[in-house]
């Protein structure tokens, strides 16, 4: 086989491998149920893998509400970083495969392969965007923190009314509550305020609800449908390609019978020739006929 043809074949194989790996990996990450998210007292100061690709860490000083306010960091976790690396490798293999098709000028024979590859590329891009969208950490963690802060301040009997109002001033500013000069009335207004934790969007696939649980968003059903169709199409196509390759290899390995140079294909006898004694009667007849 020509060197360029070998490279072209291997570019096909590598692209198929990366396509299937990315499609399966990103699909799993896109439908993974998020972990518990919020202002978790027992995990303050630790990195918490909340979604499949993102983690957050709350500053431990946020617990000292007398001098500090809420502060937290968001970053990609190991799965998120691995997903970016895998996606870059997939894009490079896709481009390399296109280059090889162009070099050997095999656009027409590779038309079906290109159509399937582009469909898979669009599906992978769709999944990659979904898993890379940053979750709604800000609203969820803030709601959780201020719910905790309000309960702590109202239950702390050592604080004066003025001190409670000073500490809860961040609560008032965050939720845009009216500023009231009377400390007792202001605290009453804060106590009546209800924080909305129902049906908040966490990421494209899940919504966040009170009591720290998640429900499926409408988009996840669209993801199931799109990826299901792509799975079926790619499975049928690649299965047919594998069968075709196996049949081709089988034909090449068939043992053909060697023909004689004169064009005849005579099989050799396995049995040895038997030696037959001459018939006396026939000999007498031949002598009479002078044969």
UniProtKB/Swiss-Prot annotation:
Places the protein is found: Cell membrane
Record GO cellular component, one term: plasma membrane
Entry membrane topology: Multi-pass membrane protein
Keywords, sorted A to Z: Cell membrane, Membrane, Transmembrane, Transmembrane helix
Transmembrane regions: 13-33, 84-104, 111-131, 219-239
Keyword Transmembrane helix among record annotations: yes
Main location: membrane
Protein name in UniProt: Uncharacterized protein UU183
């Amino acid at each position: 086989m020509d060197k360029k043809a070998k490279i072209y074949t291997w570019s096909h194989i590598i692209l198929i491998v990366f396509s299937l790996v990315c499609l399966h990996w990103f699909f799993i990450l896109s439908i993974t149920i998020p972990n518990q998210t919020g202002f978790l007292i027992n995990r303050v100061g630790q990195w918490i893998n909340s979604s499949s690709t993102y983690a957050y860490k709350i500053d431990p000083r946020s617990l000292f509400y007398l001098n500090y306010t809420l502060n937290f960091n968001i970053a990609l976790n190991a799965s998120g970083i691995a997903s970016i690396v895998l996606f870059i490798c997939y894009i490079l293999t896709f481009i390399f495969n296109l280059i090889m098709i162009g070099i050997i000028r095999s656009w027409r024979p590779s038309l079906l392969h290109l159509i399937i590859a582009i469909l898979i590329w669009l599906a992978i891009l769709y999944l990659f965007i979904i898993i890379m969208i940053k979750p709604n950490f800000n609203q969820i963690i803030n709601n959780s923190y201020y719910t905790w802060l309000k309960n702590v301040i109202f239950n702390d009997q050592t604080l004066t009314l003025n001190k409670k109002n000073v500490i809860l001033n961040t609560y008032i500013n965050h939720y845009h509550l009216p500023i009231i000069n009377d400390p007792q009335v202001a605290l009453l207004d804060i106590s009546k305020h209800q924080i909305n934790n129902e049906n908040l969007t966490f990421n494209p696939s899940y919504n966040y609800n009170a009591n720290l649980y998640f429900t499926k968003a409408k988009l996840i059903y669209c993801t199931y449908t799109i990826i299901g169709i792509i799975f079926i199409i790619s499975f049928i196509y690649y299965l047919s390609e594998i069968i075709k390759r196996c049949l081709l290899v089988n034909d090449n390995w068939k043992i053909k019978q060697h023909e004689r140079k004169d064009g005849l294909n005579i099989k050799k006898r396995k049995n040895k020739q038997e030696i037959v004694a001459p018939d006396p009667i026939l000999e007498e007849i031949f002598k009479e006929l002078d044969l």
